[in-house]
Design a protein with these regions (language model features):
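CBM-like, beta-strand-rich accessory domains located in the C-terminal region of large
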Residues: 11-12, 16, 454-646
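Secondary-structure capping and boundary motifs in well-ordered enzyme cores
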Residues: 136, 188-195, 240, 267, ...
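Terminal accessory carbohydrate-recognition/targeting modules of carbohydrate-active enzymes
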Residues: 14-55, 406-409, 413-457, 462-468, ...
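Bacterial N-terminal signal peptides
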Residues: 1-6
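Inter-helical turn/loop segments and adjacent helix faces that build the functional surface
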Residues: 151, 206-217, 255-258, 306-318
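Active-site-adjacent structural elements in folded domains
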Residues: 126-128, 182-186, 209-213, 226-236, ...
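Carbohydrate-active enzyme catalytic cores, enriched for enzymes
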Residues: 249, 284, 291-446, 627-628
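Extracellular glycan-targeting catalytic surfaces
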Residues: 11-236, 242-249, 301, 343, ...
Length: 646
């Protein structure tokens, strides 16, 4: 099995000097200087805590009740075909469907979303329900195995063994749902990997409660076929590959397969290569969605837990030192209200710090915040490996202007403004037509931000959210960036940044400069075409009420002859201007930001309602020159409110 992955020397395109020395104020090194730790399990201490501490006793009562309710109520079925977790979206607006454990068509006749109380249960949505159910079911197996280990309840061990037998006996009866994709229990190998981690943990927890011959059958009928599937795919640097290598490594630890362990770590696309080649010099995952920092961190954390309990965490020392920074790096990007920028295609706007995440990983990546948060939590982690008392609280790092050239991003901060500039991409995966996009905050108030995307299964994902019109970018004939490209950082200073995309589209060069000047934020955008006059323009989006001058007329012809994404705007009006338009954006609370857009000659300005984070919408502008031209420069100036708290 190990030999299914070819081994080769990894390269390191992103220099990462001294990972262990980064963010020192948030790390708690031990006597050997390691800021990561090997997880422990104290079962005797756990039994004492649930016996002597009333709060822990109550927690145990609730945990047993939840597991028992699930155990007597639910059984997976071979005839249930799995779907894609991203398919669980409303056909109305792409908002997430609400999952619960009621069986579709048997116990409930509709699904629902925040915007739609009755969503038809189609085969595709039923398959979405199955994939979530199956993941929950496997998680319940782990919880039941822990309860058995804690209390000695043999009925729980019998149930877990029975479930493992069910999956092993029937594994090959689940046919892969996509040609060329070997996942069986789930729709994709990513979900196969993240749940294989749970299966592995359930068997580990059973320990001697599962006879050797039964473990051998599980290995032969289930674990080895899963390993073969995971090792046959994702031969690349990718977030999914991280999960697959980490899952296989945990199977290797469970069954003592050292060759498999070595290959999962040291293979050409093993874990070491994934982190060396997939994490930028700014300690951001190269696919750029900031959510992938935590996603990759969780994969490494799952392996680190297993390795620590097996006495082998030290073999992962350099990788753990690097992964620790994935937790901390987003702190330097946060806006004053704690929100994070949203480059690429994350499904929601993140926050930093994320206390729940810091608490979740404290057993391997302790931080003052993580220990403090974990100290408030009662769960299996804090029962088995109680968090140490946190040291004195640490202040979050001050966000300052910063060039993140390794990640193709920059931050400007000054005079009440904070800007996040995303000028290029490093990989095709998860990229959007958003090169040269920027987000702007005035103090704690978002003026313009990237909403991310909806579930990948929604037509709005590729049809709107991934397209240029959804971003603050230059447009040519209504189209933005084609493909993906690193772009060129042409200059950076604490109060100004400039970058270009020489091949923004075939025959098109685009460039943008952002500057903090005399209290204002000034955006200068240039477009040049090599193939003659084109319709040149740009899009701008706002989180407040746009107060435009004069009378606009309804633009019934708005989407005619334009790319698909234009059809998602509603209530569109239009007016023609010459050289400049001035208006205000009302952010609420008496804060109104004056905005002026300058353009060469006559232009049309459309205003409309566009999709925001579902189910919300926002006010958006599209500017386009009346006459086609071969080049144009647009200057947008945002001035500070006359009297506003920062």
């Amino acid at each position: 099995v190990a030999g299914l992955i070819a081994t080769a020397a990894a390269t390191t395109p992103y220099p990462k000097p001294a990972p262990a020395a980064q963010f020192p104020e948030f790390k708690l090194p031990d006597r050997q200087g390691n800021a990561w730790r090997a997880a422990r399990e104290d079962w005797e201490g756990a039994r004492r805590r649930v016996r002597e501490d009333p709060d822990w006793a109550e927690w145990l009562r609730r945990e047993r009740a939840e597991v028992e309710r699930w155990r007597v109520r639910h059984q997976d079925r071979v005839e249930w075909l799995p779907g894609w977790s991203h398919d669980g979206v409303s056909p109305k607006d792409g908002s997430r469907l609400v999952w619960n454990d009621r069986i579709p068509r048997e116990e409930v006749q509709f699904f629902s979303s925040p915007s739609d109380p009755e969503v038809e249960i189609t085969p595709k949505l039923h398959a979405w329900w199955v994939v979530t159910f199956r993941g929950q079911h496997v998680e319940m197996m782990v919880r039941a195995a822990r309860l058995h280990r804690l209390t000695g309840d043999e009925a729980l061990a019998d149930w877990v063994r029975g479930q493992l037998d069910f999956y092993a006996d029937n594994f090959l009866r689940w046919e892969p749902q996509r040609p060329g994709h070997p996942a069986r229990l789930f729709w994709q190998t990513l979900t196969e990997a993240s749940n294989l981690v749970k299966f592995t943990e359930a068997v580990r927890l059973l320990g001697p409660a599962s006879p050797p011959e039964q473990r051998a059958a599980w290995l032969r009928q289930f674990f080895l076929p899963e390993v073969r599937a995971l090792n046959s795919t994702q031969q690349a640097i990718h977030n999914i590959a991280v999960w697959q290598r980490c899952a296989v490594a945990q199977v290797a630890l469970l069954f003592g397969d050292n060759d498999l362990w070595r290959e999962a770590l040291d293979g050409r696309f093993g874990l070491r290569a994934q982190l060396a080649e997939g994490v930028t010099g700014d300690f951001l995952w190269q696919e750029q969605s900031l959510g992938y920092n935590s996603f990759v961190l969780r994969a490494v954390h799952s392996l680190a837990l297993a390795a620590g309990l097996s006495g082998r965490a030290g073999e992962l020392g350099p990788e753990l030192a690097l992964a620790h920074n994935l937790l901390l790096a987003p702190l330097v990007l946060r806006f004053p209200n704690g929100e994070l920028p949203n480059p690429a295609d994350s499904g929601r706007i993140g926050r930093a710090p994320a206390p729940d995440l810091f608490a979740e990983v404290y057993r391997v990546f302790p931080t003052p915040l993580g220990l403090e948060e974990a100290g408030r939590v009662r769960d299996w982690n804090t029962l088995l490996d109680p968090p140490a008392l946190p040291p004195a609280a640490v202040r979050l790092p001050e966000v300052a202007s910063r060039s993140l050239e390794s990640s193709r991003m920059a931050v400007l901060r000054g005079g009440g403004w904070q800007v996040f500039f995303h000028y290029g991409q490093l990989t095709r995966t998860h990229s959007q037509a958003e090169a040269l996009n920027y987000s702007v905050y005035w103090g704690e108030r978002p003026l313009s931000r990237d909403p991310g995307t909806v579930g990948y299964g929604s037509p709005l994902h590729r049809g709107y959210y991934a397209r240029a019109l959804n971003h603050n970018v230059p447009l040519v004939d209504g189209e933005g960036q084609q493909g993906h490209a690193r772009g060129e950082l042409t200059s950076f200073a604490p109060d100004a940044v400039a970058a270009a995309q020489p091949a923004y589209r075939p025959g098109v060069r685009a460039a943008r400069a952002l500057a903090l000047r005399d209290g204002a934020l000034v955006d200068t955008t240039e477009i040049a075409t090599a193939e003659g006059p084109r319709r040149l323009g740009l899009a701008l989006h706002f989180q407040g009420r746009v107060r435009l001058p004069g009378s606009f007329r309804a633009a019934g012809e708005w989407a005619v002859g334009r790319p698909e994404e234009f059809g998602y705007w509603t209530e569109v009006t239009v007016r023609e201007f010459t050289s400049e338009v001035r208006f205000e954006v009302d952010l609420g609370g008496g804060v109104r930001v004056p905005v002026a857009i300058g353009a060469p000659g006559r232009f049309r300005l459309w205003q409309g309602s566009s999709p925001d984070v579902p189910p919300r919408r926002r006010e958006s502008l599209y500017l386009e020159l009346v006459e086609p031209v071969a080049s144009a420069t647009f200057v947008t100036a945002f001035r500070p409110p006359a009297a506003a708290a920062r």
